[in-house]
Structure formats: structure tokens, C-alpha cells
Amino acid sequence: MIKLVLIRHGQSLWNLENRFTGWTDVDLSEKGLSEAREAGAILKKNGYTFDVAYTSVLKRAIRTLWIVLHEMDLAWVPVHKCWKLNERHYGALQGLNKDETAQKYGEEQVHIWRRSIDVRPPALTEDDPRYEMNDPRYKALKKGEFPLTECLVDTEKRVLAYWHSEIAPKLKNGNKVIISSHGNTIRSLVKYLDNLSSDGVVSLNIPTSIPLVYELDENLRPIRHYYLSMDGEVPEGEIPKHITF
């Protein structure tokens, strides 16, 4: 049996401020740092270890992974960073307060932008100071690859491309893998692994910094999945307590 651990980064400063974050490189809040330490302690207590780790190029996911591995005495584990594991790009909404945006555009419209799978928010323009194309971490991207906005389908496409090319082969070769990433990135993976319908993924929420374990067969088909706590598996249907959506 193959085990895969997914973890959404701890609470970020913009989670705390209720802002759309997307590709903006925001760090963890104090609560987020504490959540990451707790996640590492949970994994260590439950006897987990890893051979390889994957994360995005955004510091909130990177720092969460560093802290988790440090708490587990696994700082030596190879870490692979890739922009394809970044959060969904929220376009012109990035940096805006979610409540204020709902007041401006209407709650229904903002709900559609956030939760539908195929509707993109308004795009950034290339002259917008939030446009990240010139950031050195993205120098390998061609202009047509760089998003100005994304829907969940767009996010899923790049996430699964990286899954099939890099992560799945490692799992099939017997490596113990952890992925530290973002809410919509993990939603995309869960949608794929569990073969969720569009309606099923709309209501799917991923809590911050609580390990989500997938047990997979040799073809990487899920046998079952569960969240972990200090006491072991969280019973089916119970939502972990600290959640930042």
C-alpha cells in the first residue's frame, strides 16, 4: 500500500486579513507558524517519514513544509519546488478584501468566482504592479504559460501535469511523499484522486495545516483517505477544528 500526505499551508497573513491571495507571496501568520509546528508533531507522533517532498514557489507553502520537516527531524529530505503547485491565480482580485469585494460586486458573483470550477475572475493586466511575470522565480515560463487569472479547471490542468510527470512516478517507485501546497491546488488533486463531480468539488474545503493521508493501491487509486490528529485518524465525517478557508 502506498501512502501520500497532502497538507495545506498554515494560516497566512492574508488569510488572517480575509484577502484574496493567489500568487501573491504572503508569509505565514503567527497562528500559521503554530499550525505548521503542530502538523509536524502530528506526523511524527503517528510514525510517518518521507523520502521526498514537493511544494510550490510561494513562501507560505515552503515555510510550512520546512517547519513540518524540522519538527519531524527530516530536514535532510529533498524538496522540489514548482510553480505548477502554486495556488490558483485570482487575477485582479488578488490583494482585495473578500467582504469588500462582495459588497462591490455582490455576494453571488464573488461566490461564483471563488467556488465555480470554470469561471475566471477578472484578469490582471500586464501593466498592473501585481503582475508577477518578471519575478525571477518564473523566468522559465513562456509568456503564454503565465496566467493573468485562473479558474479551478486551469489550476487542475497544471497541477495534474506535474502530478503525472513528477509525483506519480515517485510514488510508484515506493517513495514516501508529502506535498505542501494550497487550498485550490489540493482541491484539484482530491478531485482527481476521488473522481469528484463538479458539484462535489464546489463544496470541498481543505483545512489549513492538518495532514490529509491518502492510502493508494499500486495504480495510485485511492483505497481510503483521512485527516490525522495527535490521537491518530480523525473519524470519518468529523471536520478538524482549526480551519481557514
From Swiss-Prot:
Tell me which residues this entry annotates as catalytic: H9 (tele-phosphohistidine intermediate), E87 (proton donor/acceptor)
| Any single biological process term in GO | glycolytic process
InterPro entries the UniProt entry points to: His_Pase_superF_clade-1, His_PPase_superfam, PG/BPGM_mutase_AS, Phosphogly_mut1
Q: Which residues form a coiled coil?
A: none
> Recorded E.C. number(s)?
5.4.2.11
The record's catalysed reaction(s) read: (2R)-2-phosphoglycerate = (2R)-3-phosphoglycerate
Q: Where is this site: Transition state stabilizer?
A: H182
Q: Where does substrate bind?
A: 8-15, 21-22, 60, 87-90, 98, 114-115, 183-184
Pathway given for this chain reads:
Carbohydrate degradation; glycolysis; pyruvate from D-glyceraldehyde 3-phosphate: step 3/5
Q: Which Gene3D superfamilies match?
A: Phosphoglycerate mutase-like
A Pfam family that the UniProt record links to this protein: His_Phos_1
Q: Does the keyword Isomerase apply?
A: yes
Keywords in alphabetical order: Gluconeogenesis, Glycolysis, Isomerase
Task: List, alphabetically, the PROSITE patterns matched.
Answer: PG_MUTASE (PS00175)
A Gene Ontology MF term for this entry? phosphoglycerate mutase activity
Per the similarity annotation, which family is this? Belongs to the phosphoglycerate mutase family. BPG-dependent PGAM subfamily.
Entry-linked HAMAP family: PGAM_GpmA
NCBIfam families per the UniProt record, alphabetical:
pgm_1, PRK14115.1
Which purpose does this protein serve, as stated in its record?
Catalyzes the interconversion of 2-phosphoglycerate and 3-phosphoglycerate.
By what name is this protein known? 2,3-bisphosphoglycerate-dependent phosphoglycerate mutase
Q: Which organism is it from?
A: Bacillus cereus (strain AH187)
Q: What is the lineage of its organism?
A: Bacteria, Bacillati, Bacillota, Bacilli, Bacillales
